[in-house]
Structures are given as structure tokens and as C-alpha cells.
């Protein structure tokens, strides 16, 4: 049986690359989401024959996507967007899916979700797959939190790409 794959953030740089890769390997995608680039989302749904696609900036579509998460068992979910807004989707997903793979390329989600996210993933017998070395490092930090004074996280892309550099 083919795995059901869901991509949150298919219109971003990583999402575009993942869809192209899957297409080249004849891997079917079960569902995709986008936020701002609705034209690309529509193009992707047609080009890759993806019937389940959701424009998350549209309140009606957002509601439908949440229902979609509740009603469908997903084998692999990719969080390729940025920001912590996808925590709500992760929570819905985790309430309805077991033994799935959760691939995260979204460090804001890991930081904002913290132990709560990681513990819920473990409790629901899902498996987290950090997709970047930063995320892997964050997930495997075992220092006692009370000994931490500061944490520096570099911002090389995503929402920080066009921000002015700050001197500290």
C-alpha cells in the first residue's frame, strides 16, 4: 500500500523541491497546503494530480483542512512552513494519528512547541524526523533548562531573509 503523504507548506522553497522529487520518483502526494501563493498551490494540485489541497489563508479552507486532518490517517506529514502557527495542525494530527512519521523543517514550531510537542509525539507513538541540523540539535539538547542563560538561534532564511542584520 502506498503511504499517504501530506505536505504543509508545499508552495515554499522546500515544498517545491519535495514535490518535484516525489514526482520524479513516482511517489504520490495525498495532500498539500499553502498560505499566500494560491496560484502556485493550484498549479501544484493540477501538475501532480493532488486532489486534497488547502489554502490556509482562507478561513473556510482552513476549517476544511482541520476536518481533513481529523478524518484521514496520514503516514508521513511534512511541516515545511515557518512560524509557530502549524502547532494547531500538529495537535489535531497527533490527536488522530498513530505510528506516523512527522518530518519538521520548522524550528519555530519545535521551539514554541517544546517539550509539550515532543512528549505528545512520543505518547501517540509517532516518530519525529528533524529535517535540518539545527532542528536535530534542538531536539537532542539534554542540558538542564535551569542551567541555560541564553540561547542563540541564527536566522538564515524564511521570514528573516530580508530583515536587516542586527549588531549585538
What are these model-derived regions, one by one?
Residues 30-36, 52-57, 106:
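Short internal beta-strands
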Residues 81, 96-112:
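ADP-ribose/adenylate-binding Rossmann-like module
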Residues 49-52, 95-101, 124-126:
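A short helix->loop->beta-strand "cap" motif at the edges of active sites that frequently abuts
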Residues 7, 55, 76-80, 103-105, ...:
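General beta-strand structural signal in soluble alpha/beta enzymes
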Residues 61-94:
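Beta-loop-alpha module in the N-terminal Rossmann-like domain of NAD(P)-dependent dehydrogenases
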Residues 91-94, 114-168:
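Rossmann-like NAD(P)H-binding beta-loop-alpha module
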Residues 1-48:
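N-terminal Rossmann-like dinucleotide-binding module
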Amino acid at each position: 500500500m502506498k503511504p499517504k503523504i501530506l505536505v504543509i507548506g508545499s508552495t515554499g522553497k522546500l515544498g517545491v523541491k519535495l514535490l518535484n522529487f516525489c514526482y520524479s520518483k513516482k511517489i504520490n502526494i495525498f495532500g498539500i497546503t499553502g498560505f499566500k501563493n494560491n496560484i502556485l498551490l493550484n498549479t501544484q494540485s493540477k501538475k501532480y494530480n493532488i486532489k486534497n489541497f488547502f489554502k490556509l489563508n482562507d478561513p473556510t479552507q482552513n476549517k476544511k483542512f482541520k476536518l481533513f486532518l481529523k478524518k484521514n490517517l496520514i503516514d508521513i506529514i511534512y511541516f515545511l512552513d515557518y512560524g509557530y502557527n502549524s502547532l494547531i495542525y500538529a495537535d489535531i494530527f497527533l490527536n488522530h494519528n498513530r505510528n506516523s512519521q512527522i518530518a519538521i523543517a520548522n524550528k519555530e514550531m519545535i521551539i514554541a512547541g517544546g517539550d509539550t510537542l515532543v512528549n505528545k509525539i512520543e505518547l501517540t507513538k509517532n516518530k519525529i524526523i528533524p529535517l535540518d541540523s539545527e532542528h536535530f540539535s534542538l531536539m537532542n539538547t539534554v542540558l538542564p533548562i535551569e542551567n541555560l542563560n541564553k540561547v542563540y538561534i541564527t536566522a538564515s532564511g524564511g521570514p528573516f531573509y530580508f530583515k536587516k542584520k542586527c549588531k549585538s
